């Protein structure tokens, strides 16, 4: 067997170094003879192609195009704004025309009913109410007609009793008008004397409740008042639910009903002759919900002066009234406007009564 010669580590390293030395020399020579890369110091290499003037021309062209686009945009906005203003003006004109046309039937109707009353001798007008006072004198009686347009339902209210608030307390129409700050007032429902005072007759609705409870109509008694929507309501009611359905704001009771749905009602015989003629207060409404109040003069309650209910019934129908109700009359009949008593009370002075219808500016 042939023995392998032992080689020391140091001897192996020298041998390896001698073997690669030629290659190291070659690489060193190549590095020395190769020129290193240089950075160019010429700025022209970094200037974009084309001259500065050409570049400026391109930029100017872009700016000009942007200016044209801006002008076109501004012009478009101005045209749109002009069209909007024209459209708004046109719509406004159409609305005014529509409102004018819508109001024409009301104006025509108002002129028609006013023509039957004549020329007003006094007028009150505000954003809540319009009142026109007329004289009436058909020959057999004379008095006043007051036409009322409620622009706001709250412009009409009812007063009950006096400032004392005691049951059965009373006051004159003038006192009620003054105490509540009203511009006008009339007497309202009937009353019954007893227990040291004058108490409202039958069903009376005030301040959201029935004063003495609901009482079904009897002996031709009729309720009359105003609904919360500002419409005159009234008639004979035999159940509370029927009256509640009309949503009353206030109301009082007297007798009789004179007109219903534009037709004359049958006047009870007693009320045709007891008394025959008398000072009267009646209230009615037109189909546009304007109110008409008639207050006739009379020097006493003996039946020789004043108006009959039949005469007033006919007068109201000719005037175009739809529904009408007789209120308390005789010495109770009263009409106050602008701080003065318009009619001449048959008692010689105003009679204190429990209820009044009041009107506010």
Task: Briefly describe each language-model feature range.
Residues 167-170, 243-248, 277, 302-308:
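A short, polar/proline- and glycine-enriched secondary-structure boundary/capping micro-motif
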Residues 139, 177-179, 216-218, 227, ...:
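Extracellular/periplasmic catalytic domains that process cell-envelope and extracellular macromolecules
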Residues 160-166, 239-243, 296-300:
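Short, solvent-exposed aromatic-acidic interface loops
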Residues 2-215:
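Zymogen propeptides
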Residues 191-270:
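Active-site-adjacent helix-turn-beta-strand microarchitecture at beta-sheet edges
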Residues 141, 153, 230-231, 285-292:
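Beta-strand-turn-beta hairpins that frame and shape the catalytic cleft
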């Amino acid at each position: 067997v042939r023995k392998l010669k032992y080689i020391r580590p140091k001897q192996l390293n020298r041998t390896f170094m001698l073997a690669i030395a030629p290659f190291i020399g070659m690489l060193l020579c190549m590095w020395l003879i190769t020129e290193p890369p240089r950075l160019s110091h010429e700025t022209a290499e970094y200037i974009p192609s084309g001259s500065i003037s050409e570049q400026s021309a391109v930029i100017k062209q872009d700016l000009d195009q942007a200016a044209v686009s801006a002008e076109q945009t501004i012009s478009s906005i101005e045209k749109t704004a002009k069209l909007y203003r024209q459209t708004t003006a046109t719509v406004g004109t159409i609305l005014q025309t529509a409102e004018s046309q819508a109001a024409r039937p009301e104006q025509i109707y108002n002129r028609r009913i006013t023509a039957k009353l004549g020329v007003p001798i006094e007028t009150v007008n505000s954003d809540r109410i319009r009142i026109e006072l007329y004289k009436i004198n058909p020959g057999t009686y004379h008095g006043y007609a007051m036409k009322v347009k409620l622009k706001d339902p709250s412009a009409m209210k009812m007063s009950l009793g006096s400032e004392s608030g005691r049951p059965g307390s009373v006051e004159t129409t003038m006192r009620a008008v003054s105490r509540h700050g009203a511009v006008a007032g009339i007497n309202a429902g009937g009353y019954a004397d007893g227990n040291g005072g004058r108490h409202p007759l039958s069903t009376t609705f005030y301040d959201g409740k029935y004063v003495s409870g609901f009482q079904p109509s009897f002996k031709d008694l009729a309720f009359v008042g105003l609904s919360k929507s500002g419409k005159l309501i009234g008639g004979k009611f035999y159940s509370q639910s029927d009256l509640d359905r009309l949503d009353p704001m206030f109301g009082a009771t007297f007798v009789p009903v004179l007109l219903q749905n534009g037709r004359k009602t049958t006047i009870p015989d007693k009320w045709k002759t007891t008394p025959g003629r008398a000072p009267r207060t009646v209230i009615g409404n037109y189909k546009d919900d304007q109110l008409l109040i008639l207050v006739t003069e009379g020097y006493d309650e003996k039946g020789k002066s004043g108006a009959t209910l039949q005469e007033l019934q006919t007068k109201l129908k000719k005037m175009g009234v739809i529904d009408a109700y007789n209120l308390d009359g005789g010495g109770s009949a009263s009409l106050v406007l602008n701080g003065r008593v318009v009619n001449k009370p048959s008692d010689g002075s105003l009679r204190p009564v429990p209820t009044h219808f009041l009107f506010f500016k």
